[in-house]
Amino acid sequence: MERAAKKEAVESLNGLFQTTSVAVVAHYSGLTVAQMQKLRSQMKAAGASVKVSKNRLAKIALEGTDVVAIGSLLKGPTVIATSDDPVAAPKVAVEFAKANEKFVILGGSMGKTVLNVDGVKALASLPSLDELRGKLVGLLVAPATKIAQLTTAPAAKVARVVQAYASKSEAA
């Protein structure tokens, strides 16, 4: 790799690390090309990305970013998964690791917080931002629905009483 290409790779990685909210580091030794493509497509579908680069270049790119602490994890054949959503990359990585034993999660970082393997798994078990928004909207709409049901309930009861009285009168 030429010096200019290395510099461009470092700048690209640095820009990625500056804008990401979470990074997951994993070993991928022994994965087939098809498995790596599957990982990339799953990450892309979740709004995350996967980068494989030389560890030395990645360590240089980490300098001056919030995720600088994951530099110690960059040993051997490593892949770095990043996402803006704090749950997307960890969730896909953990699910992929369950299906592929050769994909081993080493740790990660969320902002300036360093995560070990258990931290990444805990982060993956949290609901995504969209799921949380859905629950919040559901909680906000529920009281309005109950009020609407309560205001229509007395009218419905009166209508049933009148209907019962009318059918009783017809029967007599």
Swiss-Prot record:
GO terms for biological process: translation. GO terms for cellular component: large ribosomal subunit. Keywords: Ribonucleoprotein, Ribosomal protein, RNA-binding, rRNA-binding. The keyword Ribosomal protein applies. PROSITE patterns: RIBOSOMAL_L10. GO terms for molecular function: large ribosomal subunit rRNA binding; structural constituent of ribosome. Disulfide bonds: none annotated. Pfam families: Ribosomal_L10. SUPFAM superfamilies: Ribosomal protein L10-like. The keyword rRNA-binding applies. Forms part of the ribosomal stalk, playing a central role in the interaction of the ribosome with GTP-bound translation factors. Part of the ribosomal stalk of the 50S ribosomal subunit. The N-terminus interacts with L11 and the large rRNA to form the base of the stalk. The C-terminus forms an elongated spine to which L12 dimers bind in a sequential fashion forming a multimeric L10(L12)X complex. Belongs to the universal ribosomal protein uL10 family. This is Large ribosomal subunit protein uL10. It comes from Rhodopseudomonas palustris (strain HaA2).
